[in-house]
From Swiss-Prot:
Belongs to the ChlB/BchB/BchZ family. This is Light-independent protochlorophyllide reductase subunit B. The lineage of its organism: Eukaryota, Viridiplantae, Streptophyta, Embryophyta, Tracheophyta. The active site is at D299. It catalyses: chlorophyllide a + oxidized 2[4Fe-4S]-[ferredoxin] + 2 ADP + 2 phosphate = protochlorophyllide a + reduced 2[4Fe-4S]-[ferredoxin] + 2 ATP + 2 H2O. It comes from Cycas taitungensis.
Length: 513
């Protein structure tokens, strides 16, 4: 545990609550002190849903500390069982209440014997895993609970469907554009004549989990959540899974080709007919996807050689890096992820695409790296957007964690062929806005900006005289801050405190700026 004002991935119990509140008719009991109960407000604000989050807090107060939690926890479980009639109740502590070292598994076992609902304890180590890891493990635990029970009762139907079908695993509440991505994945599978068997956990029912093995394969669009469930289903039931994220034209083709191989494995047995998705890939790439045509346009060619920094979760950071380089000709100076647990996969994916790889969950390291590189644009999380504002570098948000403005009401998928179009817009506009500011500087306008000293400036303690400021204002806005920082670095190296026009001319001559 550490105290921080910014965390890329939240505490473990948030991941468990996200999975629980994604299922239909599942309730979560959170054993925690007041102050840990912000999930309900956060979900209601960001997802803008009509219903309250199905989460109840079992408060740890002075009475609990004096007498223990057993009676209170069981009472809350039975009360919610009577009031809500859920199919499943998930009991979870928080990292704070875990300090008490209470046997919550025992409480859950006792409550399950006297309640009508199923009750399970989210078996997560709150000191070792973060929000995303906990969500992945909780989803696997729920799926395993129902499949193991059905298998033990000999009621599990493992016969595959008559037509090609798939489970989509990993779509859940508060995910980055997850609702839009799910619609796009449904459209993709419908175009390929593949039936949707189940989507979990978002909108899924735990009663239907016993039908998961009937699908021909599993589709896991994000590595962060769903991969453990897919691996469990593969090990126990021999179900193949596709984990290539269908983001960008190149990876879209690779994902569909993997689906093609999985379908054709069972097609001769089930329908005596193989499928061919190559014409679909060719048609979508050449004639339907506007992003593919845009990548060959003169506007996109203007981005060739532009520098950028990419940072986010492993899935989105890796995909945006590859799209930037392969499909738009942008140079990625540094790419990184805060998913330290998935660092090996991340490095393997992008080692040939960028100059430097950064694996960290410390936002100050990311900020320092961006200040050193001084890219033309940033693609990251909400924190990188803040950093970009301080450095006057445009930033496109491509990954969680995000603020409410990245939960759009309109249709904005990142996956599928429509997703490639949506990604191209913020990528291109992030660079184009620099020229817009330059034109405003030249011709004037109501939002013309004055020169501002940035808090991340390299020249802390340096003094610019009025004449040197006027000289600096003649430099186009979209490169002005970069020139300013280079002049300040030059002055520091020479031991100069007062920056005059002579210092500017000397720096420009030496540095070629």
């Amino acid at each position: 545990m550490r105290l921080a004002y910014w965390m890329y991935a939240g505490p473990a119990h948030i991941g468990t609550l996200r999975v629980a509140s994604s299922f239909k008719n599942v309730h979560a009991i959170m054993h925690a002190p007041l102050g840990d109960d912000y999930f309900n407000v956060m979900r209601s604000m960001l997802e803008r849903e009509r219903d309250f989050a199905p989460v109840t807090i079992s408060i740890v107060d002075r009475h609990v500390l004096a007498r223990g939690s057993r009676e209170k926890v069981i009472e809350n479980i039975l009360r919610k069982d009577k009031e809500e009639r859920p199919d499943l109740i998930i009991l979870t502590p928080t990292c704070t209440s875990s300090i008490l070292q209470e046997d919550l598994q025992n409480f859950a076992n006792k409550a399950s014997r006297i309640s009508d609902s199923d009750v399970i304890f989210a078996n997560i180590d709150h000191y070792r895993v973060n929000e995303l890891q906990a969500a992945d493990r909780t989803l696997e635990q729920v799926v395993k609970y129902y499949l193991d029970r059905s298998h033990g009762q000999e009621t599990l139907d493992q016969s595959v469907t008559d037509v090609p079908s798939a489970n989509i695993i990993g779509i859940f509440t508060l995910g980055f554009h997850n609702q839009h991505d799910c619609r796009e994945l449904r459209r993709l599978l419908r175009d390929l004549d593949i039936k949707i068997n189940q989507v979990i956990p978002e909108g899924g029912s735990v009663k239907d989990l016993i039908n998961l093995p009937r699908a021909w394969f599993n589709l896991v669009p994000y590595r962060e959540v769903g991969l453990m469930t897919a691996m469990y289903l593969e090990n126990e039931f021999g179900m193949p899974y596709v984990s290539t994220t269908p983001m960008g034209a190149v990876d879209m083709a690779e994902c569909i080709q993997q689906i093609h191989r999985n379908v054709n494995t069972l097609a001769p047995i089930s329908s005596n007919k193989k499928v061919d998705y190559e014409p679909y890939i060719d048609g979508q790439t050449r004639f339907v996807s506007r992003a593919a045509r845009f990548s060959r346009s003169i506007d996109c060619h203007n981005l060739t050689g532009k520098e950028t920094v990419v940072f986010g979760d492993a899935t989105h950071a890796a995909s945006i890096t590859k799209i930037s380089i392969r499909e738009m000709g942008i140079r990625v100076s540094c790419t990184g992820t805060y998913c330290k647990h998935d660092a090996e996969w991340f490095k393997e994916q992008i080692q040939d695409f960028c100059d430097k790889i950064l694996i960290t969950d410390d936002h100050t390291e990311v900020g320092d790296m961006i200040a050193r590189v001084e890219p033309s644009a940033i693609f990251g999380t909400q924190m990188e957007r803040h950093i970009g504002k301080r450095l006057d570098i445009p930033c496109g948000v491509i990954s969680s964690p995000v603020h409410i403005q990245s939960f759009p009401l309109g249709y904005r998928p990142f996956l599928g062929y429509e997703g490639t179009n949506q990604i191209a817009d913020p990528v291109y506009n992030s660079f184009a806005l620099g020229m817009e500011d330059h034109l405003l500087d030249i011709f004037g306008g109501h939002d013309t900006k004055e020169i501002m000293t940035r808090s991340l400036s390299t020249g802390i303690g340096l003094i610019w005289d009025p004449e040197s400021r006027r000289e600096l204002s003649k430099i186009p806005h979209f490169v002005r801050n970069k020139v300013e920082r280079n002049i300040e670095k030059f002055a520091q190296q020479k031991g100069i405190v007062n920056i005059t026009t002579e210092v500017i001319y000397a720096a420009r001559e030496v540095l070629g700026i």
